[in-house]
Structure formats: structure tokens, C-alpha cells
Amino acid sequence: MAVPKKKTSKSRKNMRRAHDFLTTQSVSVCPQCKSPKLPHRVCPTCGTYKGKEVLDVAKAS
């Protein structure tokens, strides 16, 4: 079974974990209703995507 020969230093451990952080989601604004929405997704408020109505929001709720 593999066992490390040397103890991993705090510096090396932190350098390895430098890319493990979480990133926040980018939020864009819907051009139709100006409400916040996630990019490349249908607007949950008005139901449009790229200027076309995809969902009938009044019928869905």
C-alpha cells in the first residue's frame, strides 16, 4: 500500500487546494421584464428565451 515518505507541508497543501474554491453564479438581466435570470435559460418570470415566448407563465401557475 502506498504511504507518503514525507509530511505534506501547509504551504504545499494550500497550493494544491488553490483551485478548489467555489465561484458565484453569474446573473444576467432579462431584456423583456428586466428581472434577474441565469444566462442561457428561460426567464422564470416572463417565460421568454432569446426574444421568443417559450413558456406560458400564466398557464403554468
From Swiss-Prot:
Annotated stretches, region: Disordered = 1-20
From start to end residue, where is composition biased (Basic residues)?
1-16
- Disulfide links within the chain: none
Instruction: Give the highest taxon in the source lineage.
Output: Bacteria
> Keywords of this protein's UniProt record, alphabetized?
Ribonucleoprotein, Ribosomal protein
- Family of this protein: Belongs to the bacterial ribosomal protein bL32 family.
> Which PANTHER family does UniProt cross-reference here?
50S RIBOSOMAL PROTEIN L32, LARGE RIBOSOMAL SUBUNIT PROTEIN BL32
Protein name per the record: Large ribosomal subunit protein bL32
Q: Say which species the protein is native to.
A: Pelobacter propionicus (strain DSM 2379 / NBRC 103807 / OttBd1)
